[in-house]
A protein has these predicted regions:
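Active-site-proximal cap/loop segments of hydrolase catalytic domains
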Residues: 1-171
Length: 171
């Protein structure tokens, strides 16, 4: 199918997936999501859709606002990273070209808002991690501050994302 990067479609698909998993005979009705980097970005969007059977999330190192955290830096355009992501993706059909979408939407508008999770909708317990030297830091901190769960934890660390994710102590 077509690939719409980092938008509400991810959240809606994830909602359906959570509810499908919860109905399986081997599931106790409780589901959770862990995600790092791009997968974390999807986790934010799924949790914002509030699937009834999502019991908690572990959101590690995930950008929330593509416009301010990835495509621009203090208002200065830098679409190269997103262009690299699109180039690296293997997709049989159409894939959204975020770097070039910046040319069509140079300001934070409805298009970019559709790619930002509605943080305030996230009410499940959340364990959020952010690396102090990584561009996902802002998404981790903003997400932690804005989600409405009374049970949320933020862990900031000094390392990059991948070694911490695959450390056996964290599995």
């Amino acid at each position: 199918g077509d690939v719409n990067l980092w938008g509400i479609e991810d959240g809606k698909d994830g909602y359906d997936y959570v509810e499908w998993i919860a109905k399986q005979p081997w599931c106790n009705g409780k589901t959770s999501f862990f995600g790092n980097s791009g997968v974390c970005m999807v986790v934010w969007r799924i949790a914002a859709q509030q699937p009834p059977h999502l019991s908690c999330i572990a959101a590690w190192e995930g950008t929330g606002n593509m416009y301010t955290e990835s495509l621009t830096f203090n208002g200065i355009p830098r679409p190269g990273f997103e262009n690299g992501i699109v180039t690296a993706c293997a997709c049989k059909n159409w894939i959204e070209d975020l770097g070039n979408m910046y040319l069509k939407h140079p300001y934070y508008d409805a298009y970019w808002r559709s790619k930002t999770p509605v943080w305030e909708n996230i009410k499940v317990p959340a364990y959020v991690c952010g690396g102090m030297c990584h561009f996902h830091l802002r998404g981790s901190v903003v997400g932690f501050r804005k989600i409405r769960s009374p049970k949320k934890w933020l862990r900031l660390h000094r390392d990059m994302e991948w070694p911490d994710t695959y450390n056996p102590d964290n599995m």
